[in-house]
């Protein structure tokens, strides 16, 4: 959408109003969902570019495979934020294997004050798989103790999302075909036990005891795991250690270092 600017977080992003670029000065980075536009905007005009793959399951934004293949072949490099995305890129575009550059995103653990008192609250985000979340709640309804509540997080700004994640004890993950979904990671850093789908990309961080994987669509296992965890006493020492490792993995220093590497690659042009 023309002029679109995210309202989910504060930003001062400058928006370019045209598609006029200088091949001597400009370097474009396309998200994978727009990779096929590189042919018209860059290849035909001899402008350097890269592709930022944020999700391995959205690498097919067009049925024009020739255009898409050309866009990946001519890209200077391909940025990837997870092991799963890297595998997907290598499988879809084998000739790009040597061009893949590791990237990352930051989740600031300082946003999560774990000294705040927790409530007997379960949170979830239904946006990706609403039918799944509705079924889980339906089967859970007669087994949830009266002193436990469930909160749907939907269309909230960042501040409100963090507010409820910090209050809850359990977060239900309904991620679906994600490169590496942020909500389960944020929920884990906010002090939640995570139960649910990995979205595939989440497999690299989905380790017990902090995370429990449910196979996509296995509603009954999902419900039973929630019931077990409501009553269960968790190994806090192991969970806290795992949470610290997670915070370290998504620390801002890692993203900065990866950005510096990327900028150096661009400057070599």
Locations of the language-model features?
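N-terminal pre-catalytic "stem/leader" segment of glycosyltransferase-like enzymes
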Residues: 1-27, 162, 182, 195, ...
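Aromatic "clamp/platform" in nucleotide-sugar-dependent glycosyltransferases that forms part
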Residues: 176
């Amino acid at each position: 959408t023309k002029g679109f600017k995210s309202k989910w977080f504060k930003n001062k992003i400058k928006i370019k109003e045209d598609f006029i670029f200088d091949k001597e000065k400009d370097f474009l980075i396309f998200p994978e969902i727009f990779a096929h536009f590189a042919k018209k905007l860059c290849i035909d005009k001899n402008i350097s570019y890269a592709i930022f793959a944020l999700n391995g399951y959205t690498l097919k934004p067009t049925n024009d495979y020739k255009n898409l293949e050309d866009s990946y072949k001519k890209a200077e490099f391909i940025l990837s934020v997870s092991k799963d995305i890297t595998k997907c890129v290598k499988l879809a575009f084998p000739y790009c294997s040597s061009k893949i550059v590791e990237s990352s995103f930051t989740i600031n653990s300082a946003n999560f004050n774990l000294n705040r008192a927790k409530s007997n609250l379960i949170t979830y985000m239904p946006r990706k798989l609403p039918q799944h979340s509705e079924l889980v709640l339906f089967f859970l309804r007669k087994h949830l103790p009266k002193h436990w509540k469930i909160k749907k997080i939907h269309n909230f700004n960042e501040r409100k999302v963090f507010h409820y994640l910090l209050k809850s004890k359990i977060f239900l993950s309904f991620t679906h075909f994600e490169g590496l979904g942020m909500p389960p990671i944020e929920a884990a850093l906010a002090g939640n036990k995570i139960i649910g789908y990995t979205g595939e990309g989440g497999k690299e961080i989905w380790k017990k005891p902090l995370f429990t994987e449910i196979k996509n669509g296995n509603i009954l296992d999902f419900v039973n795991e929630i019931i077990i965890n409501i009553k269960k006493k968790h190994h806090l020492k192991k969970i806290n250690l795992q949470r610290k490792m997670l915070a370290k993995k998504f620390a801002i220093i890692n993203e900065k270092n990866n950005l510096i590497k990327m900028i150096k690659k661009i400057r070599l042009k």
